Amino acid sequence: SKDAFDSYLFLDGKTKDNTTYPNTDVAVMESSKNDNLPHLNIQDLLKVRDKRLALTIDSVLCYGDGWPRIAGGQPMTSSSGYGICKYDNVAIDPNYRQQTSSNYTSAPLYWLAVIYLNYAEAKAELGTISNDDLNNTINLLKDRAGLPHITIDVADAGDNNMGVEPLIWEIRRERRCELMFDNDFRYWDLIRWHQLDKLDNSTNPDILLGANVVNDSSIDHEKSGDYLDGSTGRVRAFEAKHYLYPIPSGQITLNPKLEQNPLWKKN
């Protein structure tokens, strides 16, 4: 989504509202790749952001009838327009790159980055984190991303919508960007932070907005202004009970002493 895209900082370590880099989100129409099919390209937008973004999101937008990001391959499409390229290994046979049943790309089972992120977050939440801690964890990831280091006195970035201290917010941002699309980390993080309400598109109507497609005049549906709108015809409502799963009714039948989780009880 655009919200996820915009969570990645610019190379000066600032958000789109504060950066010294060009902060346009308008894609450029071109027809120079894969059989000269016209497509919107965001390569210039990726160049000025956190280096991880270009390794996560494809430089070509795909929507509508789709776009074959692999030459000769099947068209790919996305409700947000953003195509995923993370873990796509261009060195392997194209036939395997676009199959879900057999792909020879190595996938991590556990990340050193997760250890860094967990440690930094725990220390920050306890109020015991130091600049040395940041240099041994978060700032190592910043180096790889081509971003400036942060300190314990990091300034408010202006996009904090969780009501937490600026340092906690930046650690959460780092976690989001580093682990984007990985193993449902984001979903479970939002649960433990009690922030699932941010995904409710009835109260946050822009949360499912996608890419800026103003330069493609052929699109006449599923848009909100200049942006693709993935929420068209879809309602994603939040309820507090979603922080817990219900205990299966069969288990309660087996053990009547089990009590259903709060808010899942039938009247």
Model-identified regions with their sequence ranges:
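Extended substrate-binding grooves/exosites of carbohydrate-active enzymes
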Residues: 1-4
